[in-house]
Amino acid sequence: MTVETTNSSPVPGTIDAPPSAHGLIDRSKLRTLAQRSNRRGAARLAVHLGCVGTTGTLVWLTLPVWYLLVPAMVLHGITIVTMFAPMHECTHRTAFSSRRANDLVGWCAGVLSSYNATYYRYYHAWHHRYTQDPARDPELMYPRASDRLAYLKEISGLMFWYRRAIDYPALALGRAGALPFAPAEARHAIALSMSCQLLIYLAAAVAIAMGHNAALYFWFLPALLAMPLLRGYLITEHTGCSPDGNGLSNTRTTVALFPIRLLMWNMPYHAEHHLFPSIPFHQLPALHRQLRGRLAHVAPGYLATNREIFLSL
């Protein structure tokens, strides 16, 4: 599927609130909620990295015992693949008040979680702007699961890794010209960023081939084992929601347990985030309290929502 462009394309990489958000929150309240904080961003990042270190220690302690090692790697993998969340927050430049901190942390978090922050910023801006538009939403470049087998392939992570193997080398070679959300002036930066990221993966792979298995046990295998959990999280965000531009009904908020809210940087409040993408992660719970009664989709949990999606196919 191709993503169509229009003659009135906004400034690439910028994200405004959709029309459906207008009038929902008082402007003075929005200004208060939109205050970004280096301190809050650094604190959340420190907690997340602490979880990475703690679960990594569990992997190290269980290395000789496979029946303990696999659960430890799953736990560790969860902390790695959820580095997607700070990457996402940083591409909005809302994790920190410092633009430099957002860009640096976002890129590093993307490397860990197998996303490229430079590319994702432009991709994601169009996703916000054209949410659920099958011709222009980049998330719909690849069709959503239309049957149970396709759902299982998506949830397993197989399609994610396949697309990474195809798309990322092409982007590193500068082949972003067919993507309308990647402006000409950004394509060199995307190619350079992607090349640097792939070199890191290549260096890790070479180290493994030479018998140095740290990246295998503390990064690659944990990410592979935990990726289905991230896919199960992401598939709930828009699947089954209204196929239109109404931010009150085209995105799902999920009532999540504290560990999920912690590691996903409050992104379970996803409808709120889509309505007001300039609000930083630490203010999303307050925004949820303001908006909950207006939202069409507030789900009780990820297992229940995935079950509903699966049974609907």
What are these regions (language model features)?
Residues 83-92, 120-132, 233-240, 264-279:
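Histidine-centered catalytic micro-motifs
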Residues 7, 179-237, 246, 251-252, ...:
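C-terminal membrane-associated helical module and adjoining short loops/tails
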Residues 55, 91, 95-96, 245, ...:
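Active-site-flanking alpha-helical
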Residues 1-77, 111-216, 281-313:
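Non-catalytic, topology-defining segments of multipass membrane proteins
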Residues 77-87, 116-120, 164-167, 218-245, ...:
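Transmembrane alpha-helical segments that form the membrane-embedded catalytic/substrate-channel core
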Residues 29-34, 62-63, 95-99, 253-256:
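Helix-boundary and loop/linker segments of multi-pass membrane transporters
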Residues 86-104, 138-142:
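Aspartate-rich (DDxxD/NDxxD/DxxxD) Mg2+/diphosphate-binding motifs
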